[in-house]
Amino acid sequence: MKLYLISQNVNNGYDTFDSAVVAAESEQEARETFPDNNSEWRTYELDEDGFWVDEDGENPMEWAENASQVSVKYLGEAAEGTQSGVILASFNAG
């Protein structure tokens, strides 16, 4: 398992995520990790074109709309036993 910094600069207003540290097996898996997929209100999944959509088919306003808009930087190896997902996210509350 590896650690990555993911970031975006598409949606930069208030109530948006600008970056997150994620644990993933690959750069692509990191790129496809949504910073807040543990929300009890809304969960996003990638559609066949690489766009995040919620259960109503809406795109997120708080993160990049498409996985291709996400930058990924390798940080290092995760500690043994680390599970994939978001470790820490940066949210700009309004």
Predicted feature residues:
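Short beta-strand element of the conserved SAM-dependent methyltransferase core
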Residues: 4-6, 21-22, 43, 72
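Short aromatic-glycine-(Arg/Gly/Cys) micro-motifs in beta-strand/loop hairpins
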Residues: 1-16
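Short, mixed-charge low-complexity intrinsically disordered segments
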Residues: 36-94
